[in-house]
């Protein structure tokens, strides 16, 4: 055994043994060999960007610790891995480097896989998938065709968010402050045909399940999904009009529909606002250049509800009027930049007295404000509007003719009934959720399996012709989708209906399609006949999913929808894919910067600067080591290449080892909390592992005596010190086991540190009982450390003979707490005289009251305090204290 801990030798040796033994290959156990059943734990699959970052290390270590612990507990545990391999970064890298995206992607996969293996992760690589592989995306295409058959997938032309730099459609969620989430380009609005999935058909079930069937998810994530789905119950009704188009036909059949959750305020309508794309807006703009210019301006504005809520409210009058359905009054129609055509009917009623947004708009343009709700029975001035609006309490109708005096619900019911009687409205439930547009005008994605025929239009590709394979030789040049001009992609394509020459669809699928079901493919990755089969029945639903909070809405919502579609198609038997969800915290590091010579911001690596502290030790600034000049300290932020505050896991592993990287990321903060990087703490983790190794070396040197004790069957009695060691070890073991169950890995690590401290503080008197206690206790430490630092634990387990006695650590059971070891031979009780603390008294564990009284009365502390005075009364509180009254 090496005297010094050499992490490179230890880790390479362990990994070589695991790979040779195919140690982590898992099968569906139906024999009962795994008494606790199956457990499926999975991290969100990474994008193969080139290198792992510390966020990856933290995520995968959390998963790996859970996996190894549960295997020791008797579970059949699956931990797979794959690659979310389609997407824009590969195209951009191809343009930059002049190589096909496929080559760039597969090179990155190979490198990142080596990094994962260097981390010692217990991944079953036999189940590896890459979403850019035709054997995988064939099933994207197959399910898309099934959705077409069922009417879940459909084609339509709609106003969409267009990123002019990436030349593609963006979902609302991908537009931030009016700009593309990736390029930062100002997003345009365009009418483009594309394919959509009816996720709205599942809105009620998606909402109900996230509210009531996912107790293992963080409340924050469940609330985010609930708000995104956005169920609203209200009334949809029409304002009538006589506005006609150029042909003389009534626009919209003479009705302009709106939806409101506050039908009780309908008598307070003083204007209506429509979206810039609304038919009435476009009709009015045809003869109004100023209005037309305003509509063009709106196209460059925000595209999400959140953005529209915060941007300045602007509008232009159309010169058109519609008729109020209950009063018959004429209501002016405006175009508002805060109205979305994609939500509801693209029109809203304006009730400025009772809606914050309408109030802001009306005040700006001098529109009438009519109060029709009285809160708490009091009349409020318009000047005090903000006070009572913010209260949001239900009130009674006023200034509302026949509805005066009705409470909110009664008023809504009455208004809805009157509108229904006129044939102009009805109660309705609406949803914030919109159908999922899956068409992307990009090359590197799953080809949509559609053929375009001049005679028959869009025709599905026959199932026997799947997969439609994406050409691998394209090198995007920024001039649009190269599939348009790729001759091989369209060569020989004929219409499945008439057999005439045709062309393939060149749009590809949103990459969120790829990540919506990969976790099911892990269960049966090599099946070329079925999308999923018996493996999914065994492993699904997933027991524990691990990933970032940034995926709370899009990925997790789409995955839930995809699962329900697969269920309805008879492919799986589950309603929800993920039983428990853990969203790990971000990894942060310090940020240092100063203005560069050319006016930009120059960022410095933390290793390049020296911190400046105030009297309290707080960092207030820094100076660059090379020139001594001051730099700004910006605090901590997410690690990123652009700010030079990242830490390369490969460098960390080479310098300190994978076990140190794993231990540090688990010890520094609970899994859900942010982790603030600290180089000194990394050193501390490494020192701890050296201490463990050094203790193992000491045990190895004494193994002759230990072997003698083993040969004797460890029948020797434990001495006092050995009993105390075992009591401490098993007490901490009990807590560590509990913390593993809670996935509180920071306290798991601190518990292991307590175990080592107890071992180091133990004085070995050379007796067989002492050797026995040491051998058992260090074995417990190694098994408790194994999920966090598997290489070190594996090496010491083998070197010290545990493997020869108990088998490989891979298959070792979790150590059981010995309840007998927790029992103490003697206990120490607090001694009080006349209620005041005077010392302590030691008695045998389980001593009766008479024995405790006798020991207390004979104690030196009592005799000194009593000074000969007799005891009048002795009060014993079992297990805690003795109080003697004199």
From Swiss-Prot:
One Pfam family recorded for the sequence: tRNA-synt_1g
Gene3D superfamilies listed in its UniProt record: 2.20.28.290, 3.10.20.590, HUPs (3.40.50.620), Isoleucyl-tRNA Synthetase, Domain 1 (1.10.730.10)
Motif 'KMSKS' region per record, residues: 638-642
Ranges annotated as spanning the membrane: none
Listed EC numbers: 6.1.1.4
Motif ('HIGH' region): 46-56
Superkingdom classification of source: Bacteria
Entry-linked InterPro entries: aa-tRNA-synth_I_CS, aa-tRNA-synth_Ia, Leu-tRNA-ligase, Leu_tRNA-synth_edit, M/V/L/I-tRNA-synth_anticd-bd, Methionyl/Leucyl_tRNA_Synth, Rossmann-like_a/b/a_fold, tRNAsynth_Ia_anticodon-bd
Enzyme class: ligase
Keywords: Aminoacyl-tRNA synthetase, ATP-binding, Cytoplasm, Ligase, Nucleotide-binding, Protein biosynthesis
First-listed, main subcellular location of the protein, grouped into a coarse class: cytoplasm
Amino acids binding ATP: 641
Catalytic activity: tRNA(Leu) + L-leucine + ATP = L-leucyl-tRNA(Leu) + AMP + diphosphate
GO terms (BP aspect): leucyl-tRNA aminoacylation
HAMAP family xrefs: Leu_tRNA_synth_B
Family classification: Belongs to the class-I aminoacyl-tRNA synthetase family.
Name of the featured protein: Leucine--tRNA ligase
Record lineage: Bacteria, Pseudomonadati, Pseudomonadota, Betaproteobacteria, Burkholderiales
